[in-house]
Amino acid sequence: MMFLLPFLTVFLAKQSHTRTHSLRYFRLAISDPGPGVPEFISVGYVDSHPITTYDSVTRQKEPRAPWMAENLAPDHWERYTQLLRGWQRTFQTELRHLQRHYNHSGLHTYQRMIGCELLEDGSTTGFLQYAYDGQDFIVFDKDTLSWLAMDNVAHITKRAWEANLHELQYQKNWLEEECIAWLKRFLEYGSDALERTEHPVVRTTRKETFPGITTLFCRAHGFYPPEISMIWKKNGEEIVQEVDYGGVLPSGDGTYQMWVSVDLDPQTKDIYSCHVEHCGLQMVLEAPQESGNTLLVANTISGTIILIIVLAGVGALIWRRRSREPKEVMYQPTQVNEGSSPS
């Protein structure tokens, strides 16, 4: 198997059994929706999993995950259905006020995001912000009990909301305490789905995209959770510019996919390698020197990661442990506001 060594190197880091989790609620109001488009929508997520939904057409809060339906009684859904109907009226009124202040008519949107995160080290974060027509409008700072306004109209809202000290403290408490309590409860309800790990299948390919231009592609698919790091290196140095990234996208089967590519001169003697990190698993695949691909499949068996490498039709089984802890992988949250309990 020595002939494989120039093509790839595989590192295994000790697997971590903790990860960052988030609970987020989103609201959206639309001032002039078209036929069949709700005027108001509210959706809840744990990590990337939708858990609740409500809209102005159904006017019912409903579960989006089976483990939510199984663990929350019917009176929970009825109680928050009534609350959401009230929040719908309030949210649509706020949108009309903003349109008057901006002197706008026609189609406009108003969004709200609230949520919290439980980090790997046990610490927590909370976030609450609003957007108008997709642009940041006002953001809550729970540490200073104040609002950060993004324009002159937002300053009007800031003055009104900061006059209510009780509400400011209430939002802080919800973000720091109640939101985290609900998140922990939901993680318990959906542990089988939310705590699982599926490592990616990673493939590097080389193809001529234009005359004189060769593109290297590194593709990962079939992984969960969606947090992943993928970079290209040239002669051991990370390539920062001239790299194209595809976003982390759902595959439709509960897993995710992503790609990253880089162009090169086909006559170059430089060595290019794709570096992938996912839940403590670190993989380095050297790009093929000729048209073709390198495929790496990672599976977990009894706590030991087995890597099956298929290169040019030849299969090899390689495994190796490393005691080094994994680096932090990338994660980008978003945000919403939902009252004293999940909605």
From Swiss-Prot:
It holds the Pfam family MHC_I. The alpha-1 domain is a structural part of antigen-binding cleft. The alpha-2 domain is a structural part of antigen-binding cleft. 8-(9H-purin-6-yl)-2-oxa-8-azabicyclo[3.3.1]nona-3,6-diene-4,6-dicarbaldehyde binds at residues 25, 27, 61, 76, 112. CDD domains: IgC1_MHC_I_alpha3. Residues 19-197 are annotated as: Antigen-binding cleft. Residues 200-302 form the Ig-like C1-type domain. Its main location: membrane. Antigen-presenting molecule specialized in displaying microbial pyrimidine-based metabolites to alpha-beta T cell receptors (TCR) on innate-type mucosal-associated invariant T (MAIT) cells. In complex with B2M preferentially presents riboflavin-derived metabolites to semi-invariant TCRs on MAIT cells, guiding immune surveillance of the microbial metabolome at mucosal epithelial barriers. The chain crosses the membrane at residues 299-319. Glycans are attached at residue 103. The keyword Lyase does not apply. Residues 320-343 are cytoplasmic. GO terms for cellular component: early endosome membrane; endoplasmic reticulum; endoplasmic reticulum membrane; external side of plasma membrane; extracellular space; Golgi membrane; late endosome membrane; MHC class I protein complex. Residues 198-289 are annotated as: Alpha-3. Residues 106-197 are annotated as: Alpha-2. Pyridoxal binds at residue 61. 5-(2-oxopropylideneamino)-6-(D-ribitylamino)uracil binds at residues 27, 42, 61, 112, 170-171. Expressed in kidney, liver, testis, spleen, thymus, brain, and heart. This is Major histocompatibility complex class I-related protein 1. Keywords: Cell membrane, Disulfide bond, Endoplasmic reticulum, Endosome, Glycoprotein, Golgi apparatus, Immunity, Immunoglobulin domain, Innate immunity, Membrane, MHC I, Signal, Transmembrane, Transmembrane helix. GO terms for molecular function: beta-2-microglobulin binding; T cell receptor binding. It is found in: Cell membrane; Endoplasmic reticulum membrane; Golgi apparatus membrane; Early endosome membrane.
